[in-house]
Amino acid sequence: MAENSLLGKLDGLVSRFEEVGTLITDPAVIADMKRFVKLNKEYRDLEKIVGARSEYVKVLNGIEEAKALLESEQDPEMREMAREELDTCNERIPALEEEIKLLLVPADPQDDKNAIVEIRGGTGGDEAALFAGDLYRMYVKYCELKGWKISVSSFSEGSSGGFKEIIFTVSGEKVYGTLKYESGVHRVQRVPATETQGRVHTSAATVAVLPEADEFDVEINEGEIKWDTFRSGGAGGQNVNKVESGVRLRYVWKNPITGVSEEILIECTETRDQPKNKERALTRLRSFIYDKEHQKYLDDIASKRKTMVSTGDRSAKIRTYNYPQGRITDHRINYTIYNLSAFMDGEIQDCLDHLIVAENAERLKESEL
């Protein structure tokens, strides 16, 4: 086989793949959970690259064999078969090379994590809260389509419905890597139910998507956490307002980016079981701190890119939902969909796919492979 620069980049990774495969069966490594999880993720990532390399080598060999057959074979039928094989293999090469190049570009290390999603009504008062509720229902339906699990941590209802704020966790495969594109300001243009003149109003809601931190991702001195309990409201029953199942934690933490100490306040009324609420409040605390550290990673990426798809900038207007025209426009990629009702029913994958393609193009361009 002729010298191939792309294969040269992969040779060392094959050796590392074999090394990691041995390490994750070592009892000493298995006993070190933090190291084991890290190596397991590296193994899965390398497995994809090694698999793509094997297919690439197979196609390159097919090209060499077809060329050799054309040079040596006199039978017309055999020569025609060789030409067809050569054409087929040559057609596959560009896609395989792009796949390998993309796999070689470091992805966001948090993509495989679960996500904590926060939706807050912004400008627009009651209408903004109603729109925040619409976004929540949209994500619920999308998660149902994906087979993901949603667990609401806390919420504050709007006076006319919807939510002033709702925070929930989404669990499943590559949740953060998919939902991270939803971070930002979502703007809605429609006639509110309370509008008597039929005028179109503009409101907004903010979505923040955080990677859920694992226990060993962040070091927290649990002895410094101040806990309070309170009676949580609910739909009814004997437990309501009689058992202090709601929990509130306060934790003083030094922000590594600003260097300033700040108090983090988190409440959880997710279940009627106080220990479970404590556990989930701790998870949110870890995720909050982890997100701040992850934001530095995103800022570093943003400083290197001229165009950005998923920078994590939660103040950027990312999408407009225009009800009179039945359209949604994603401003990051200037992509418009004319099926708003289906979109609000959770059919958002097409838009996400376009965002993923745009970001992959950015990653390939900046990698200079």
UniProtKB/Swiss-Prot annotation:
Localization, UniProt: Cytoplasm
UniProtKB keywords: Cytoplasm, Methylation, Protein biosynthesis
SMART domains associated with the record: PCRF
Pfam families assigned to the protein according to its UniProt record, in alphabetical order: PCRF (PF03462), RF-1 (PF00472)
Membrane-spanning residues: none
Modified residues (N5-methylglutamine): 238
Record-level Gene Ontology MF annotations: translation release factor activity, codon specific
Record PROSITE patterns: RF_PROK_I
Post-translational modification remark: Methylated by PrmC. Methylation increases the termination efficiency of RF1.
Any single GO CC term annotated in Swiss-Prot or TrEMBL for this entry: cytoplasm
Record's keyword annotation contains Nucleotide-binding: no
InterPro entries: PCRF, Pep_chain_release_fac_I, Pep_chain_release_fac_I_sf, Prokaryotic/Mito_RF, RF-1
Key word Cell cycle present: no
Signal peptide, first to last residue: none
HAMAP family, A to Z: Rel_fac_1
Function: Peptide chain release factor 1 directs the termination of translation in response to the peptide chain termination codons UAG and UAA.
Family per similarity comment: Belongs to the prokaryotic/mitochondrial release factor family.
Protein name in UniProt: Peptide chain release factor 1
Gene source species: Parabacteroides distasonis (strain ATCC 8503 / DSM 20701 / CIP 104284 / JCM 5825 / NCTC 11152)
Gene: prfA
